[in-house]
Amino acid sequence: MSLSLWQQCLARLQDELPATEFSMWIRPLQAELSDNTLALYAPNRFVLDWVRDKYLNNINGLLNDFCGSEVPLLRFEVGSKPAVRAHSHPVTASVSAPVAPVTRSAPVRPSWDSSPAQPELSYRSNVNPKHTFDNFVEGKSNQLARAAARQVADNPGGAYNPLFLYGGTGLGKTHLLHAVGNGIMARKANAKVVYMHSERFVQDMVKALQNNAIEEFKRYYRSVDALLIDDIQFFANKERSQEEFFHTFNALLEGNQQIILTSDRYPKEINGVEDRLKSRFGWGLTVAIEPPELETRVAILMKKADENDIRLPGEVAFFIAKRLRSNVRELEGALNRVIANANFTGRAITIDFVREALRDLLALQEKLVTIDNIQKTVAEYYKIKVADLLSKRRSRSVARPRQMAMALAKELTNHSLPEIGDAFGGRDHTTVLHACRKIEQLREESHDIKEDFSNLIRTLSS
């Protein structure tokens, strides 16, 4: 049996799985082949259960492919693989992947769980106790982000450091930041967890410079157990703040202290931020949060209504969720308005009542046919992610919806072909033109494509 068995499995899994899933769940595994048994070691119980639940069939299938009649037994354990023993063959996870350009030095402080408190500094946590994992509504759009955040809360300073969450406004990034903070402090009551908006870091640094207290500023930020910074894109063009955060970032990572960052865009797409910082943002795990799909939007509304002791009929929740697709904050704001109107008037919450209470918001939504809106609608219709439409993937399950979205953008907006191409991952105008012609051809040849196009036009224009 080849000593490279696990490397072969890894190579195939890397091809078959989305990059985020592979990095998050498969790459942390260690493997050891001994006495016809392949032992896979997960860093914690959470990862072990997830891999066994989601990827066991994939792994068993690959073992059958590679080993034929000599398939080894598969065993899962929590922890690290033991030191190399006689007659055993260690198997490492060395598949081709980007490697961080520096080697981290050994930690210069005790491990996270054993780090002593430093009472001479006063830490302002700012973590909102109301935002927890329990009241975060999970769906396909945020499942990976929630799972990564949960693991960081259980094992801060571990494999996913830094954790970088990105996505549009109002999708739950801030909620997850607070949930991680609450999770860490639940495990260790005196944990030094600091949450802040990136602008607060800038303000603190400016104040420290003005008061000749920069050393105290450095000591404060470099001695926390976990630093949670929201909207890191606001560091753009603030060179001195970036310089200081660069050194803070390095110090925290070397000390095994957890860093979690959020942004409205992928790290490499943040303009005005130094390349060395953007590179470091991707050293751990980067996860996108997509706009919630219909089922998740309905669940969010029902949970919010339940928290307010309001009976929300399912058909009303569906009516609201179907018309407000952009983000969680907009959904919750709309529901708050409906609840307030119901309380003021004493009327029952029905679809007709919601039409009246939200008439201006619904009218505005009906006028908003933008490329972003088209992308979200098409992604939801074909049950893929917006990120897939913007990616370089060429499989038919992604390429055809991408062509459909481009054709709809040309049909329903005033954007030029180059502008549409730019909105779809920087493609050129000839790609957009080809997509439009292809969909036009398929609408004549395929009843399904013709129906899809009509349904999407109706949804976007209604």
Curated annotation (Swiss-Prot):
Which parts of the sequence are annotated with region: Domain IV, binds dsDNA? 343-462
Question: Which of this chain's residues are annotated to bind ATP?
Answer: G170, G172, K173, T174
Database matches in InterPro entries: AAA+_ATPase, Chromosome_initiator_DnaA, Chromosome_initiator_DnaA-like, Chromosome_initiator_DnaA_CS, DnaA_C, DnaA_dom, DnaA_N_dom, DnaA_N_sf
Which region ranges are annotated with the description Disordered? 105-127
Q: Where are the transmembrane segments?
A: none
Q: What GO CC annotations are associated with the protein?
A: cytoplasm; plasma membrane
Example GO biological process: DNA replication initiation
Disulfide connectivity for this sequence is none
Instruction: Extract the NCBIfam families matched here.
Output: DnaA (TIGR00362)
Q: What is this protein's function?
A: Plays an essential role in the initiation and regulation of chromosomal replication. ATP-DnaA binds to the origin of replication (oriC) to initiate formation of the DNA replication initiation complex once per cell cycle. Binds the DnaA box (a 9 base pair repeat at the origin) and separates the double-stranded (ds)DNA. Forms a right-handed helical filament on oriC DNA; dsDNA binds to the exterior of the filament while single-stranded (ss)DNA is stabiized in the filament's interior.
Identify this protein by name.
Answer: Chromosomal replication initiator protein DnaA
